[in-house]
Amino acid sequence: MSLAVKDLSTASSSSSKAIPVKIIPLQYPDSTSSDPHCHSIPFNDFFSRWTAKIKRMTFFDWIDAIFPCFLWIRTYRWHQYFKLDLMAGITVGIMLVPQAMSYARLAGLQPIYGLYSSFVPVFVYAVFGSSRQLAVGPVALVSLLVSNALSGIVDPSEELYTELAILLALMVGIFESIMGFLRLGWLIRFISHSVISGFTTASAVVIGLSQLKYFLGYSVSRSSKIMPVIDSIIAGADQFKWPPFLLGCTILVILLVMKHVGKAKKELRFIRAAGPLTGLALGTIIAKVFHPPSITLVGDIPQGLPKFSFPKSFDHAKLLLPTSALITGVAILESVGIAKALAAKNRYELDSNSELFGLGVANIFGSLFSAYPTTGSFSRSAVNSESEAKTGLSGLVTGIIIGCSLLFLTPMFKFIPQCALAAIVISAVSGLVDYEGAIFLWRVDKRDFTLWTITSTTTLFFGIEIGVLIGVGFSLAFVIHESANPHIAVLGRLPGTTVYRNMKQYPEAYTYNGIVIVRIDAPIYFANISYIKDRLREYEVAIDKHTSKGPDMERIYFVILEMSPVTYIDSSAVEALKDLYEEYKTRGIQLAISNPNKEVLLTLARAGIVELIGKEWFFVRVHDAVQVCVHYVNRPTDVEESSKPSLWRRSGLKNSSTYTEVESNIVLEEPLLSREK
């Protein structure tokens, strides 16, 4: 590493003008203070804030926390909002009816269960959910996960399959509610956006291929892996039938065109929402008029609202635990992501944990009325927002539309072609193929692109569960790697200033002979302390190679650690710091520390590091440390040890806002900045 080095002694001697160096006193917290907050650990601090917040809550605060709908009910503007909410609810309802039946088929269930899953959860979420635009109901990704998990346990034609799907909704709801109540939503932050994008892209491809059987007219293997599906499609090619293929492709083209037109022109956004219903109507008319024998129909659908019943088959709950946890994670990522974006767009605050609780309660109540797992939908939420929905009332209107469909329209659904439902699914998941995101990652961050590629590839070829586990594993590995290998910079002084910056970023910065300044840009703990020590040794060697300013400057005398970015230091790091100091001491190198924060300084003081290194070697600014170190580098060798500046004594001036000059027995002079180039 090439470093620019400046000989301060030469600059000092050549300067005819000099100014006295002034050191800012370092304020040291009293380690024996009776202030209880001085010794609080992060968990206790969080717990105390949480309990204090609970104590401050009034009756109405509790009502708003449990029932977020009261936040918008109290301030509802009927003349401004009602018409918008009504139209948005009708629009989403028209879109949801065909999508719900399509996603139920994707989940391996009868279409009626898609409508059941769109009824009660919608009403419950409108009361307990915190997002005012999120459209809750069946979604493609969760439906695929349900199918993939249950098909390995029981055949979809058996009644047990449906019972397990309903039980899965209860388990997912419990998971979500617990996470929301315990405020554990932050755990999802460890899953990279690259993993989410790669997973959804691969899942969209698998979903699309799984629906081709309704286009081709023959059975295709049910699998979450791409190769068995492709092999099955090729093996059954001799059974191909033209009528369902032509009808399915026609409906798919209509859906894609209507979606594109609705997105491109805001005034025609209703066309996008009407696409699925248009496709169903066209398919139903053709099937009713021409009766093509090769086109399979949905068949009879029960009429009426879902009845209350408690989920069954609890003896299979243990088998469903991994899948329910996976569905919970995917549902959270899909719902909370779009809910936050919509809240920011509509300028209101959204609590992720409250959102989790609302989704959980919706799934729990839904499972009591024959629903399978539901979550927020990207496409329907976007349509809801574009339709200018203002509050959760739009969700209530959507629920009424679904209820009317269950009561009056189900006899008409028996003539819907299966290929029409498949076309709706393929049209919906086409938007999940995030090729633009992959291009962006390739252009911006090759590591994230690698993570995207790994996740999508493993999901395609090894299945959804393996793909998610590997993707999350690599995501956590990257986080751990970054934490264990933190960024460390060698600092240099910018000419004409007292500012010290990374020399790689600012090549014009210079250092002083015999001194190396290192900034650690991360907390220091057991996982990264060895790496930090190794890097410090490397920097020391690199500095030595470029130092040749006379016999007294042929090596490093001082190492200054700039610790302002260090927010935390643990016991392992403290012990390693002691070892580093002892190692430096045997080689005649003095360690100095600049600007540690309060908690770090308290930890160092309690561990005896401050006394070990010397109180006089702790500074507020890097520049203070540099000037004192330069003085020792340049002073005559016979100067008494008693002449060391006692910065710790100066720090005893509590709350002092004035600069304190170095003691009179130390004559420190600094060349004027104009000459330091």
From Swiss-Prot:
It holds the Pfam family STAS. The gene is SULTR4;2. Gene3D superfamilies: STAS domain. Keywords: Membrane, Sulfate transport, Symport, Transmembrane, Transmembrane helix, Transport. One of its GO terms (cellular component) is membrane. InterPro entries: S04_transporter_CS, SLC26A/SulP_dom, SLC26A/SulP_fam, STAS_dom, STAS_dom_sf. It comes from Arabidopsis thaliana. The keyword Transport applies. Residues 1-83, 130-133, 183-189, 263-269, 340-355, 414-420, 481-677 are cytoplasmic. NCBIfam families: sulP. Residues 505-629 form the STAS domain. It is a multi-pass membrane protein. The keyword Transport applies. It is found in: Membrane. The chain crosses the membrane at residues 84-104, 109-129, 134-154, 162-182, 190-210, 242-262, 270-290, 319-339, 356-376, 393-413, 421-441, 460-480. One of its GO terms (molecular function) is secondary active sulfate transmembrane transporter activity. Signal peptide: none annotated. CDD domains: STAS_SulP_like_sulfate_transporter. Residues 105-108, 155-161, 211-241, 291-318, 377-392, 442-459 are extracellular. It comes from the Eukaryota. This is Probable sulfate transporter 4.2. Belongs to the SLC26A/SulP transporter (TC 2.A.53) family.
